[in-house]
Amino acid sequence: MAAARPTVSIYNKDGSVSSETLALPFVFKAPIRPDLVRSVHTAVAKNKRQPYAVSEKAGHQTSAESWGTGRALARIPRVGGGGTHRSGQAAFGNMCRSGRMFAPTKTWRKWHVKVNQNEKRYAIASAVAASGVPSLLLARGHRIEEIPEVPLVVDDAVQSFQKTKEAVALLKEIKAYRDVIKVANSRKLRAGKGKLRNRRHVQRRGPLVVFNEDTGIVKAFRNIPGVEIVNVRRLNLLQLAPGGHLGRFVIWTKSAFGLLDSVFGSTTEVAQLKKNYFLPENIISNADVTRLINSDEIQSIVKAAGPSRVKRAHVQKKNPLKNKAVLSRLNPYAKAYKANVKINSEKTPKAAGEKFLSVLHEN
Protein backbone atom coordinates (compact mmCIF):
# COMPACT_ATOMS: atom_id res chain seq x y z
CA MET A 1 0.00 0.00 0.00
CA ALA A 2 1.42 3.36 -1.00
CA ALA A 3 -0.03 5.71 1.59
CA ALA A 4 -1.95 5.15 4.80
CA ARG A 5 -2.76 8.64 6.16
CA PRO A 6 -6.55 9.18 6.17
CA THR A 7 -6.48 12.99 5.73
CA VAL A 8 -4.21 15.56 4.10
CA SER A 9 -3.63 19.13 5.29
CA ILE A 10 -4.06 22.17 3.05
CA TYR A 11 -1.47 24.97 3.05
CA ASN A 12 -2.17 28.63 2.32
CA LYS A 13 -0.05 30.75 -0.02
CA ASP A 14 1.81 32.17 2.98
CA GLY A 15 2.84 28.66 4.09
CA SER A 16 0.46 28.44 7.06
CA VAL A 17 -1.72 25.39 7.63
CA SER A 18 -5.41 25.81 6.84
CA SER A 19 -8.11 24.53 9.15
CA GLU A 20 -9.50 22.45 6.28
CA THR A 21 -8.42 18.91 5.48
CA LEU A 22 -9.10 16.55 2.60
CA ALA A 23 -9.58 12.80 2.62
CA LEU A 24 -6.78 10.88 0.94
CA PRO A 25 -7.98 9.82 -2.56
CA PHE A 26 -8.17 6.11 -3.30
CA VAL A 27 -5.61 6.40 -6.09
CA PHE A 28 -2.85 6.82 -3.49
CA LYS A 29 -3.61 3.27 -2.32
CA ALA A 30 -3.17 1.78 -5.81
CA PRO A 31 -0.47 -0.87 -6.34
CA ILE A 32 2.94 0.57 -7.23
CA ARG A 33 4.27 -1.33 -10.26
CA PRO A 34 7.75 -0.12 -11.34
CA ASP A 35 7.93 -2.78 -14.06
CA LEU A 36 4.65 -1.67 -15.63
CA VAL A 37 5.54 2.03 -15.39
CA ARG A 38 8.89 1.41 -17.07
CA SER A 39 7.44 -0.57 -19.99
CA VAL A 40 4.54 1.85 -20.59
CA HIS A 41 6.87 4.86 -20.40
CA THR A 42 9.21 3.29 -22.96
CA ALA A 43 6.32 2.77 -25.37
CA VAL A 44 4.60 6.13 -24.82
CA ALA A 45 7.85 8.09 -25.13
CA LYS A 46 8.30 6.71 -28.66
CA ASN A 47 5.14 8.48 -29.82
CA LYS A 48 6.84 11.90 -29.58
CA ARG A 49 9.63 11.06 -32.03
CA GLN A 50 10.05 13.07 -35.21
CA PRO A 51 10.61 10.96 -38.34
CA TYR A 52 14.07 11.22 -39.83
CA ALA A 53 15.81 9.78 -42.87
CA VAL A 54 18.86 10.37 -45.04
CA SER A 55 18.46 11.98 -48.44
CA GLU A 56 17.44 9.65 -51.25
CA LYS A 57 20.22 11.19 -53.37
CA ALA A 58 22.95 10.81 -50.75
CA GLY A 59 25.93 8.83 -52.06
CA HIS A 60 24.64 8.83 -55.65
CA GLN A 61 25.33 12.45 -56.61
CA THR A 62 28.28 11.55 -58.81
CA SER A 63 28.86 9.84 -62.14
CA ALA A 64 30.54 6.46 -61.85
CA GLU A 65 30.74 3.33 -63.97
CA SER A 66 32.36 -0.05 -63.42
CA TRP A 67 35.57 -0.71 -65.31
CA GLY A 68 34.64 -4.35 -65.65
CA THR A 69 37.10 -7.21 -65.44
CA GLY A 70 40.66 -7.50 -66.61
CA ARG A 71 42.31 -4.78 -64.52
CA ALA A 72 42.86 -6.76 -61.30
CA LEU A 73 40.51 -4.34 -59.49
CA ALA A 74 37.12 -4.75 -57.92
CA ARG A 75 34.13 -4.35 -60.22
CA ILE A 76 32.61 -1.58 -58.05
CA PRO A 77 31.60 1.54 -60.05
CA ARG A 78 34.44 4.05 -60.29
CA VAL A 79 34.46 7.80 -60.90
CA GLY A 80 35.69 8.68 -64.38
CA GLY A 81 37.91 11.49 -65.60
CA GLY A 82 41.40 12.47 -64.54
CA GLY A 83 43.46 15.24 -63.04
CA THR A 84 42.05 14.77 -59.54
CA HIS A 85 42.31 12.31 -56.67
CA ARG A 86 38.60 11.56 -57.06
CA SER A 87 38.97 9.99 -60.49
CA GLY A 88 39.22 6.25 -60.29
CA GLN A 89 37.86 6.09 -56.75
CA ALA A 90 35.05 3.65 -55.99
CA ALA A 91 31.55 5.10 -55.55
CA PHE A 92 27.96 4.27 -54.59
CA GLY A 93 28.63 1.23 -52.38
CA ASN A 94 28.17 1.29 -48.63
CA MET A 95 31.80 0.17 -48.23
CA CYS A 96 33.06 3.16 -50.23
CA ARG A 97 34.15 6.57 -49.07
CA SER A 98 31.42 9.10 -50.00
CA GLY A 99 29.08 6.21 -50.82
CA ARG A 100 25.54 5.71 -49.61
CA MET A 101 24.74 3.89 -46.36
CA PHE A 102 23.44 0.34 -46.33
CA ALA A 103 19.61 0.26 -46.29
CA PRO A 104 19.07 4.05 -46.24
CA THR A 105 16.60 5.09 -43.53
CA LYS A 106 13.06 5.98 -44.62
CA THR A 107 10.50 8.25 -43.02
CA TRP A 108 7.79 5.60 -43.28
CA ARG A 109 9.29 3.53 -40.50
CA LYS A 110 6.81 2.39 -37.81
CA TRP A 111 7.43 5.13 -35.25
CA HIS A 112 4.42 4.83 -32.96
CA VAL A 113 3.69 2.07 -30.46
CA LYS A 114 0.16 1.17 -29.41
CA VAL A 115 -0.33 0.77 -25.66
CA ASN A 116 -3.43 -0.74 -24.09
CA GLN A 117 -5.65 1.90 -22.52
CA ASN A 118 -6.07 0.02 -19.24
CA GLU A 119 -2.31 -0.52 -19.08
CA LYS A 120 -1.67 3.22 -19.44
CA ARG A 121 -4.22 4.01 -16.75
CA TYR A 122 -2.69 1.44 -14.41
CA ALA A 123 0.76 3.00 -14.93
CA ILE A 124 -0.52 6.53 -14.26
CA ALA A 125 -2.32 5.38 -11.10
CA SER A 126 0.90 3.72 -9.91
CA ALA A 127 2.86 6.90 -10.59
CA VAL A 128 0.35 9.01 -8.64
CA ALA A 129 0.48 6.55 -5.74
CA ALA A 130 4.29 6.65 -5.76
CA SER A 131 4.21 10.46 -5.54
CA GLY A 132 2.79 10.04 -2.03
CA VAL A 133 5.73 7.99 -0.70
CA PRO A 134 8.50 10.25 0.68
CA SER A 135 11.21 7.59 0.39
CA LEU A 136 10.59 7.23 -3.36
CA LEU A 137 10.76 11.01 -3.84
CA LEU A 138 14.06 11.19 -1.98
CA ALA A 139 15.42 8.21 -3.92
CA ARG A 140 14.60 10.01 -7.15
CA GLY A 141 16.66 12.99 -6.01
CA HIS A 142 14.02 15.56 -5.01
CA ARG A 143 15.02 17.88 -2.17
CA ILE A 144 11.96 17.50 0.04
CA GLU A 145 13.68 17.25 3.42
CA GLU A 146 12.02 20.44 4.71
CA ILE A 147 8.53 20.28 3.19
CA PRO A 148 5.75 19.77 5.75
CA GLU A 149 4.15 16.63 4.30
CA VAL A 150 3.62 14.42 1.27
CA PRO A 151 1.29 14.66 -0.67
CA LEU A 152 1.58 18.45 -0.58
CA VAL A 153 -1.70 20.32 -1.18
CA VAL A 154 -1.99 24.12 -1.48
CA ASP A 155 -5.03 26.38 -1.49
CA ASP A 156 -6.94 27.18 -4.69
CA ALA A 157 -5.84 30.81 -4.44
CA VAL A 158 -2.62 29.64 -6.09
CA GLN A 159 -4.54 29.02 -9.34
CA SER A 160 -5.11 32.78 -9.71
CA PHE A 161 -1.41 33.71 -9.50
CA GLN A 162 -0.39 35.99 -12.36
CA LYS A 163 3.28 36.71 -11.61
CA THR A 164 6.29 34.42 -11.39
CA LYS A 165 7.46 36.19 -8.22
CA GLU A 166 4.23 35.06 -6.52
CA ALA A 167 4.91 31.45 -7.53
CA VAL A 168 8.53 31.67 -6.30
CA ALA A 169 7.34 33.14 -2.99
CA LEU A 170 4.90 30.23 -2.56
CA LEU A 171 7.61 27.63 -3.24
CA LYS A 172 9.84 29.31 -0.66
CA GLU A 173 7.06 29.40 1.95
CA ILE A 174 6.27 25.69 1.62
CA LYS A 175 10.03 24.83 1.62
CA ALA A 176 9.93 23.45 -1.93
CA TYR A 177 12.30 25.98 -3.49
CA ARG A 178 15.36 23.83 -2.65
CA ASP A 179 14.26 21.50 -5.44
CA VAL A 180 14.23 24.42 -7.90
CA ILE A 181 17.75 25.46 -6.82
CA LYS A 182 18.91 21.88 -7.41
CA VAL A 183 17.51 22.03 -10.95
CA ALA A 184 19.14 25.39 -11.70
CA ASN A 185 22.52 24.11 -10.51
CA SER A 186 22.21 20.95 -12.62
CA ARG A 187 22.07 22.79 -15.97
CA LYS A 188 24.94 21.51 -18.13
CA LEU A 189 25.96 21.24 -21.78
CA ARG A 190 24.57 18.20 -23.49
CA ALA A 191 27.03 15.56 -24.64
CA GLY A 192 26.95 14.75 -28.35
CA LYS A 193 25.44 16.24 -31.49
CA GLY A 194 22.30 17.40 -29.68
CA LYS A 195 24.17 20.63 -28.92
CA LEU A 196 23.82 21.48 -32.61
CA ARG A 197 20.13 20.55 -32.78
CA ASN A 198 18.47 23.06 -30.44
CA ARG A 199 19.00 20.79 -27.43
CA ARG A 200 22.13 22.49 -26.14
CA HIS A 201 21.55 22.09 -22.39
CA VAL A 202 20.23 19.38 -20.07
CA GLN A 203 18.90 19.74 -16.54
CA ARG A 204 17.05 17.75 -13.88
CA ARG A 205 13.31 17.83 -13.24
CA GLY A 206 11.75 19.82 -10.41
CA PRO A 207 8.23 19.87 -8.90
CA LEU A 208 5.13 19.09 -10.95
CA VAL A 209 2.24 21.46 -10.19
CA VAL A 210 -1.21 19.97 -10.79
CA PHE A 211 -4.17 22.37 -11.05
CA ASN A 212 -7.88 22.19 -11.82
CA GLU A 213 -8.62 25.52 -13.55
CA ASP A 214 -6.11 27.83 -15.20
CA THR A 215 -6.79 31.40 -14.10
CA GLY A 216 -3.17 32.47 -14.49
CA ILE A 217 -1.26 29.65 -12.77
CA VAL A 218 0.34 28.38 -15.99
CA LYS A 219 2.01 31.70 -16.79
CA ALA A 220 3.08 32.14 -13.18
CA PHE A 221 4.93 28.80 -12.96
CA ARG A 222 6.07 28.13 -16.53
CA ASN A 223 9.34 30.11 -16.36
CA ILE A 224 10.71 28.54 -13.16
CA PRO A 225 13.56 26.07 -13.88
CA GLY A 226 12.45 22.44 -13.76
CA VAL A 227 8.84 23.20 -12.77
CA GLU A 228 6.17 21.64 -14.98
CA ILE A 229 2.45 22.24 -14.79
CA VAL A 230 -0.47 20.05 -15.88
CA ASN A 231 -4.24 19.85 -15.55
CA VAL A 232 -5.53 17.10 -13.26
CA ARG A 233 -7.68 15.78 -16.13
CA ARG A 234 -4.60 15.44 -18.35
CA LEU A 235 -2.14 13.65 -16.08
CA ASN A 236 0.70 12.28 -18.17
CA LEU A 237 3.07 9.42 -17.36
CA LEU A 238 5.95 11.28 -19.04
CA GLN A 239 5.57 13.98 -16.37
CA LEU A 240 4.57 11.80 -13.41
CA ALA A 241 7.47 9.37 -13.95
CA PRO A 242 10.18 11.03 -16.08
CA GLY A 243 12.55 8.47 -17.52
CA GLY A 244 10.25 5.71 -16.27
CA HIS A 245 11.36 6.38 -12.67
CA LEU A 246 8.70 6.59 -9.97
CA GLY A 247 8.62 9.29 -7.30
CA ARG A 248 7.96 12.71 -8.91
CA PHE A 249 7.50 15.55 -6.43
CA VAL A 250 3.93 16.79 -7.05
CA ILE A 251 2.28 19.93 -5.65
CA TRP A 252 -1.52 19.70 -5.83
CA THR A 253 -4.06 22.48 -5.67
CA LYS A 254 -7.03 21.84 -3.38
CA SER A 255 -9.62 21.41 -6.15
CA ALA A 256 -7.31 19.21 -8.23
CA PHE A 257 -6.60 16.95 -5.25
CA GLY A 258 -10.32 16.67 -4.50
CA LEU A 259 -11.04 15.72 -8.12
CA LEU A 260 -8.76 12.65 -8.09
CA ASP A 261 -11.56 10.35 -6.90
CA SER A 262 -13.67 11.47 -9.87
CA VAL A 263 -10.77 10.93 -12.28
CA PHE A 264 -9.67 7.50 -11.04
CA GLY A 265 -12.60 6.21 -8.94
CA SER A 266 -11.86 3.38 -6.51
CA THR A 267 -11.70 -0.40 -6.46
CA THR A 268 -15.48 -0.57 -5.89
CA GLU A 269 -16.80 2.66 -7.48
CA VAL A 270 -16.46 3.47 -11.16
CA ALA A 271 -14.56 6.63 -12.16
CA GLN A 272 -16.82 9.49 -13.24
CA LEU A 273 -14.42 10.88 -15.85
CA LYS A 274 -13.46 7.48 -17.32
CA LYS A 275 -15.86 5.01 -18.85
CA ASN A 276 -16.27 1.78 -16.84
CA TYR A 277 -12.92 2.16 -15.08
CA PHE A 278 -12.11 0.80 -11.63
CA LEU A 279 -8.83 1.25 -9.82
CA PRO A 280 -6.55 -1.82 -9.79
CA GLU A 281 -6.44 -3.74 -6.54
CA ASN A 282 -3.57 -5.39 -4.71
CA ILE A 283 -3.48 -9.18 -5.02
CA ILE A 284 -2.35 -9.37 -1.39
CA SER A 285 -3.23 -6.74 1.20
CA ASN A 286 0.18 -6.91 2.89
CA ALA A 287 3.09 -6.62 0.48
CA ASP A 288 5.65 -7.54 3.16
CA VAL A 289 5.97 -11.20 2.15
CA THR A 290 8.95 -11.81 4.46
CA ARG A 291 6.88 -10.78 7.46
CA LEU A 292 4.08 -13.12 6.39
CA ILE A 293 6.38 -16.10 5.90
CA ASN A 294 8.07 -15.58 9.26
CA SER A 295 4.79 -15.14 11.14
CA ASP A 296 3.92 -17.66 13.87
CA GLU A 297 0.76 -18.79 12.06
CA ILE A 298 2.63 -19.92 8.95
CA GLN A 299 5.78 -21.16 10.67
CA SER A 300 3.71 -23.41 12.96
CA ILE A 301 2.58 -25.57 10.01
CA VAL A 302 5.72 -25.36 7.86
CA LYS A 303 8.24 -28.18 8.03
CA ALA A 304 11.57 -27.38 9.62
CA ALA A 305 14.36 -26.59 7.23
CA GLY A 306 16.59 -29.59 6.58
CA PRO A 307 20.29 -29.65 5.81
CA SER A 308 21.24 -27.63 2.80
CA ARG A 309 22.04 -29.56 -0.35
CA VAL A 310 24.38 -27.83 -2.67
CA LYS A 311 24.34 -29.24 -6.18
CA ARG A 312 27.72 -29.57 -7.75
CA ALA A 313 28.20 -26.98 -10.45
CA HIS A 314 30.07 -29.32 -12.79
CA VAL A 315 30.05 -33.12 -12.72
CA GLN A 316 32.99 -34.74 -14.49
CA LYS A 317 32.00 -37.77 -16.55
CA LYS A 318 34.27 -40.73 -15.79
CA ASN A 319 34.72 -43.91 -17.80
CA PRO A 320 33.76 -46.97 -15.68
CA LEU A 321 35.93 -49.20 -17.89
CA LYS A 322 38.99 -47.27 -16.73
CA ASN A 323 37.92 -46.03 -13.31
CA LYS A 324 37.56 -48.85 -10.75
CA ALA A 325 35.66 -46.74 -8.22
CA VAL A 326 32.99 -45.78 -10.76
CA LEU A 327 32.78 -49.38 -12.04
CA SER A 328 32.27 -50.79 -8.55
CA ARG A 329 29.56 -48.19 -7.90
CA LEU A 330 27.73 -49.17 -11.08
CA ASN A 331 28.35 -52.93 -10.75
CA PRO A 332 29.20 -54.05 -7.19
CA TYR A 333 29.87 -57.62 -8.44
CA ALA A 334 32.70 -56.43 -10.73
CA LYS A 335 35.17 -56.33 -7.85
CA ALA A 336 34.42 -59.93 -6.83
CA TYR A 337 34.53 -61.06 -10.46
CA LYS A 338 37.99 -59.58 -10.97
CA ALA A 339 39.20 -61.20 -7.75
CA ASN A 340 37.99 -64.63 -8.94
CA VAL A 341 39.69 -64.18 -12.29
CA LYS A 342 42.92 -63.31 -10.55
CA ILE A 343 42.70 -66.39 -8.26
CA ASN A 344 42.06 -68.72 -11.20
CA SER A 345 44.94 -67.29 -13.15
CA GLU A 346 47.31 -67.89 -10.25
CA LYS A 347 46.71 -71.67 -10.32
CA THR A 348 49.64 -73.79 -11.69
CA PRO A 349 49.14 -74.26 -15.44
CA LYS A 350 49.72 -77.60 -17.20
CA ALA A 351 53.00 -78.26 -18.87
CA ALA A 352 53.11 -77.67 -22.60
CA GLY A 353 53.60 -81.35 -23.44
CA GLU A 354 50.76 -82.57 -21.24
CA LYS A 355 48.39 -80.06 -22.81
CA PHE A 356 49.40 -81.25 -26.32
CA LEU A 357 48.91 -84.91 -25.44
CA SER A 358 45.50 -84.26 -23.97
CA VAL A 359 44.42 -82.56 -27.18
CA LEU A 360 45.64 -85.53 -29.27
CA HIS A 361 43.83 -87.95 -26.97
CA GLU A 362 40.57 -86.07 -27.44
CA ASN A 363 40.93 -86.30 -31.21
UniProtKB/Swiss-Prot annotation:
Q: Which PROSITE patterns match?
A: RIBOSOMAL_L1E
Principal cellular location given in the protein's record: cytoplasm
Which InterPro entries does the protein's record reference?
A: Ribos_uL4_C_dom, Ribosomal_uL4, Ribosomal_uL4_dom_sf, Ribosomal_uL4_euk/arc_CS, Ribosomal_uL4_euk/arch
Q: Name one GO biological process term.
A: cytoplasmic translation
Indicate yes or no for the key word Ribosomal protein: yes
The listed locations are:
Cytoplasm
Please give the Gene Ontology molecular function terms for this protein: RNA binding; structural constituent of ribosome
Which keywords does this chain's UniProt record carry? Answer: Cytoplasm, Ribonucleoprotein, Ribosomal protein
GO cellular component terms?
A: cytosol; cytosolic large ribosomal subunit; preribosome
Region C-terminal-extended nuclear localization signal, as annotated, extends over: 280-363
Q: Which residues cross the membrane?
A: none
The family classification in the record reads: Belongs to the universal ribosomal protein uL4 family.
The free-text domain note is: The eukaryote-specific C-terminal extension harbors a nuclear import signal and delivers the ACL4-uL4/RPL4 complex to the pre-ribosome, triggering uL4 release from ACL4 and incorporation into the 60S ribosomal subunit.
Q: Remarks, anything else? A: There are 2 genes for uL4 in S.pombe.
Subunit composition? Component of the large ribosomal subunit (LSU). Mature yeast ribosomes consist of a small (40S) and a large (60S) subunit. The 40S small subunit contains 1 molecule of ribosomal RNA (18S rRNA) and at least 33 different proteins. The large 60S subunit contains 3 rRNA molecules (25S, 5.8S and 5S rRNA) and at least 46 different proteins. uL4 is associated with the polypeptide exit tunnel. uL4 interacts with its chaperone ACL4 and the nuclear import receptor KAP104.
Role noted for this protein: Component of the ribosome, a large ribonucleoprotein complex responsible for the synthesis of proteins in the cell. The small ribosomal subunit (SSU) binds messenger RNAs (mRNAs) and translates the encoded message by selecting cognate aminoacyl-transfer RNA (tRNA) molecules. The large subunit (LSU) contains the ribosomal catalytic site termed the peptidyl transferase center (PTC), which catalyzes the formation of peptide bonds, thereby polymerizing the amino acids delivered by tRNAs into a polypeptide chain.
Protein name from the UniProt record: Large ribosomal subunit protein uL4B
Give the originating organism. Answer: Schizosaccharomyces pombe (strain 972 / ATCC 24843) (Fission yeast)
